Structures are given as C-alpha cells and as structure tokens.
C-alpha cells in the first residue's frame, strides 16, 4: 500500500570514534557559521546541471519494489525510467513516470528548513568531523510531531560540507488522522564533487499503524550514482 505522504527518506549514520568537543560560546558560534556556509554551498549547487542514476528500493509491509531512474538534463525528456522490479521499463511505464516527474519537478529539498540553526548544539568534534544536534519540525509530518523529532548532522571539515543528516523520533506522533508513527529514522547522505554538494543516499525506516488496524512497516532506500556535470566547466570550478 503506497503512502505518498511519507515519501521522506532516511537512516542512522554508522558510528565512529570522536573526541568530546568543548562547547564554549565561541566554538559554538564558529561551528554554527560553518554549518550555515555548508547550507549555502548546498543551496548554490544546481542539481539540474548534473546527469546521474538513482536506484530505488522500497519494502512496504513485505511488498518489495525497485526501480532504476536516470536524469539527463540535456535530453528532451530529462527523466527516464530504465528498470522496474529488475525488468526493463515498458513504454507505458516510461510515459507514466515522465508525467509524474513533470508534476513533482519543482519540489526541492531545503536544508535550511530542515535544520533549525538556532537550536544547534555540539555533541563532539575531532580533526575530521563535527557532530551537532538540532530540533526538527517537518511540516508534512504535522503539528503533533513538534517536540518529538530530533536531528543530528555530521560536518566534514576538510571539504567543508554536511556529509550526513539523521532524523529520528523520541515519541510516537500522529502525522494525519488515524495514522500513528511509533518509530521513524531518516538519513540523508551527501557527496562533495568539485565543490558541488549532491545527494549520495537517502534511507527511511518507519513503523506504526494506520486506521488503527493496518500495520505500517516501511523501508525505502535511494542511492545516487554516476554523476557527470553537464554545464559549463568554469561555472563548476568558480
């Protein structure tokens, strides 16, 4: 059963050794400024100038589906459905997919809305990474989720970008009438290619109930690969 109101994407980041950071006011201000510049770098990346592939996997209550999509910005139809459930996409499926992409192409992922910068707090830092937590409110999850979602980001110092964002709930919440979410975990991973900040992987895990009797048990994983810049090279390097 499709639940389009939950198409978010997630996963928890793998653990690694860090040294506890001294959360002094000066350090906190400095780290917040780094995060803000990283968000600007993400905002300045024009994703429409890149070709890439997306491999999608979904498991909804045991109903498994997969697809491979391709983005070609210079083509007449920039989005192409290549495979669905391991088989080449039919003409009908390709046409339906292209129409759907036209309807949703203006929907953009906004880090600035996701990360509450005022609430940023340092968890730890070392010579490679800064880990910070923040408050989360996602409009699509409804007002009942306020105060029940937490976020964590990993800032990569050398390349100066946000490498990963994790979101999870600390209490059950109701995103819409008759739906109850007990477990939610989302992860957005990014890659830095010549200064452009692009999606690497999105994963979501969610459990709960719908209409009191229907179980919600979903996993989705989107993997992005084969990035090739299709714009002017001086625009990428400047």
Descriptions of predicted regions:
Residues 4-14:
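Sec-dependent N-terminal signal peptides
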Residues 16-21:
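Sec/Tat signal peptide C-region and signal peptidase I cleavage site
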Residues 22-147, 169-175, 179, 209-238:
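Structured extracytoplasmic
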Residues 78, 130, 160-162, 197:
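Hydrophobic residues embedded in beta-strands of well-ordered beta-sheets
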Residues 148-149, 156-170:
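Long, charged/polar, surface-exposed segments that mediate recognition or autoinhibition
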Residues 153, 185-194:
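Extended lipid/amphipathic-ligand handling interfaces
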Residues 165, 200-202:
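Beta-strand-dense domains in secreted/periplasmic systems and polymorphic toxin scaffolds
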Residues 183-184, 206-208:
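Subset-of-secretome marker
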């Amino acid at each position: 059963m499709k639940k389009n109101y939950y198409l978010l994407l997630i996963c928890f980041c793998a653990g690694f050794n860090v040294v506890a950071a001294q959360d002094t006011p000066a350090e906190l201000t400095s780290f917040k400024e780094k995060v803000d510049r990283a968000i600007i770098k993400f905002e300045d990346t024009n994703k429409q100038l890149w070709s890439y592939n997306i491999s999608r996997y979904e498991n909804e209550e045991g109903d498994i589906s997969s697809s491979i999509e391709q983005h070609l910005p210079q083509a007449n139809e920039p989005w192409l459905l290549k495979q669905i459930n391991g088989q080449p996409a039919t003409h009908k499926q390709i046409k339906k997919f292209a129409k759907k992409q036209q309807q949703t192409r203006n929907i953009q992922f906004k880090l600035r809305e996701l990360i509450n910068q005022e609430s940023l707090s340092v968890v730890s830092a070392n010579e490679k990474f800064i880990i910070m937590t923040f408050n989360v409110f996602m409009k699509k999850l409804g007002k009942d989720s306020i105060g029940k979602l937490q976020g964590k980001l990993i800032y990569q110092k050398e390349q100066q970008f946000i490498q990963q964002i994790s979101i999870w709930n600390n209490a059950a919440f109701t995103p819409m009438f008759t739906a109850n979410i007990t477990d939610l975990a989302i992860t957005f991973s990014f890659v830095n290619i010549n200064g452009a900040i692009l999606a690497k992987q999105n994963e979501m895990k969610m459990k709960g109930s719908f209409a009191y009797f229907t179980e919600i048990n979903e996993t989705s994983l989107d993997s992005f690969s084969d990035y090739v810049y299709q714009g002017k090279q001086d625009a990428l390097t400047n």
